[in-house]
């Protein structure tokens, strides 16, 4: 299929793109599943308390079962004693399994989200950036001109290195390369911006 391509002067052209990425089936259930797994795997479960079986110390009873008049107790490792284990406390990162995210799931979810952006006219493709953008002021004027104030800009690695600094202080705009964006990024921003080179890399990676 063909979609519009713009240059920085605003002139319109077209570019041939893969249907399987830009006109894919929108699978919202799959996207939700990918987001759930990604979010679960991002969580840093650093809090950890010792369970009763992890406490170092004697396992002998603290006093006899009968004859003391007190309640029955086993060892001092019990959660009711100071220095004992913690009942139902956080178990730390190793106790939780990472949810497996298949490559095919990731590819199909990205294709679904890009297709949705395309259908909503929130997908913009530019010709490759040369050395036109060197300052934040220049980048800001381009963002304002093309109404991409809330956008994820996905570039090839060399282009990203050129303009990354010029975008750093502009709010609600993120610049990344083709290897470092996720379904979360696409959903977070209203518009997604590609260049001709990043489209080619995307098609190699996700086709």
From Swiss-Prot:
GO terms for biological process: translation. It holds the Pfam family Ribosomal_L4. GO terms for molecular function: rRNA binding; structural constituent of ribosome. Disulfide bonds: none annotated. Keywords: Ribonucleoprotein, Ribosomal protein, RNA-binding, rRNA-binding. It comes from the Bacteria. PANTHER family: 50S RIBOSOMAL PROTEIN L4, LARGE RIBOSOMAL SUBUNIT PROTEIN UL4M. One of the primary rRNA binding proteins, this protein initially binds near the 5'-end of the 23S rRNA. It is important during the early stages of 50S assembly. It makes multiple contacts with different domains of the 23S rRNA in the assembled 50S subunit and ribosome. Belongs to the universal ribosomal protein uL4 family. Part of the 50S ribosomal subunit. This is Large ribosomal subunit protein uL4. It comes from Pelagibacter ubique (strain HTCC1062). The lineage of its organism: Bacteria, Pseudomonadati, Pseudomonadota, Alphaproteobacteria, Candidatus Pelagibacterales.
């Amino acid at each position: 299929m063909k979609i519009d391509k713009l240059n920085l002067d605003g002139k319109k052209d077209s570019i041939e793109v893969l249907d399987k990425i830009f006109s894919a089936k929108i699978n919202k259930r799959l996207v939700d599943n990918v987001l759930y797994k990604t979010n679960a795997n991002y969580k840093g479960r650093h809090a950890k308390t010792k369970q009763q079986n992890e406490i170092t110390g004697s396992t002998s009873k603290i006093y006899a079962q009968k004859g003391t008049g007190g309640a029955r107790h086993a060892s001092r490792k019990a959660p009711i004693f100071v220095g004992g284990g913690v009942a139902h406390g956080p178990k730390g990162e190793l106790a939780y399994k990472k949810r497996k995210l298949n490559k095919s799931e990731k590819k199909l979810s990205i294709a679904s989200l890009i297709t949705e952006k395309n259908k909503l006219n929130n997908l913009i493709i530019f010709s490759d950036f040369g050395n036109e953008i060197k300052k934040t002021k220049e980048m800001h004027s381009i963002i304002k001109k093309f109404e991409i104030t809330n956008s994820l800009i996905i570039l090839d690695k060399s282009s990203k290195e050129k303009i990354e600094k010029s975008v750093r202080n502009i709010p609600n705009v993120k610049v990344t390369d083709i290897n470092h964006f996720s379904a979360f990024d696409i959903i977070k921003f209203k518009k997604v911006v590609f260049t001709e080179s990043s489209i080619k890399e995307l098609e190699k990676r996700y086709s």
